[in-house]
Every structure is written in C-alpha cells, then in structure tokens.
Amino acid sequence: MGHFTEEDKATITSLWGKLNVEDAGGETLGRLLLVYPWTQRFFDSFGNLSSASAIMGNPKVKAHGKKVLTSLGDAVKNLDDLKGTFAQLSELHCDKLHVDPENFRLLGNVLVTVLAIHFGKEFTPEVQASWQKMVTGVASALSSRYH
C-alpha cells in the first residue's frame, strides 16, 4: 500500500485542511459519473444523470460526493492503517453494493484532478505524489475485503 513518510503526512494533512469537502466531493463524484459513465449504474436512485449539467447540478451527487470525501478524511487521520480504517466500507461495497473495485482507483484519480484544479500552483508535483500515494492506498484498502 505504500509507506507514508512524515513529509507525505504533513503534505496531505495540510492540503486537506484547506479543502472545501462539500464542493470538492460533489465535483469529484460528478466528474467520475461524467468521465466514466458506466459508474452511473451504481447510482440509479439519484435521478437525472443524462448530461453534464444534470450530473453536476444534481443534489444527490453533491451530497454523496460530500459523504465520500468526508470518509476520506478518516484516511487522512489514519494513514498508517488504511486497511483497518476502510474494512467495513470494503465489505459493504463488495457484498451489498457489488461495486467493481477498479472504480475506487478511478475515483482517486479524479480526486487528484479536482485537487489540481482547486489548488493550482500550490498543487506541486511533490504534493501530487503524496496525494496519489494516498488515493492508491485508499483504493487498495477499499478492495481488501473483496473475495
């Protein structure tokens, strides 16, 4: 899953503290649903997902995106135990929701894109490397209970 250096931890925590979870969460999930339209099948109850404006303006997309990013806050606090942190969510997504674990990797990559957009020059290659390590670790942790 990758070892997080003290510098990685400081970089991740610092940027996380500046992030508007609600805005970034909605944008991240919205972009996932738009860029990878097959992921929409997991969100049948969200209503109209027929266009970019429908997806990005959908209150259920925004609310669930906030929920997803809020749970990512648990990762920021528990970088040394991502597998344990996400054990229950991994079981839920495997056994009940039947989500393809590849989607976790895609979501992480979309989040990195959103962070780059939101933070601009502050999102240096070093910051990106730390965040990429984290989202890869989270995707791996969320996939850990699949069988």
Swiss-Prot record:
Q: Name one GO cellular component term.
A: hemoglobin complex
- List modified residues, type S-nitrosocysteine: C94
Which positions bear Phosphoserine? S45, S51, S53, S140, S143, S144
Entries under CDD domains matching the protein: Hb-beta-like (cd08925)
Highest taxon of source? Eukaryota
Q: Which residues bind heme b?
A: H64, H93
Family according to the record: Belongs to the globin family.
UniProt protein name: Hemoglobin subunit gamma-2
Species of the source? Pongo pygmaeus (Bornean orangutan)
Record gene name: HBG2
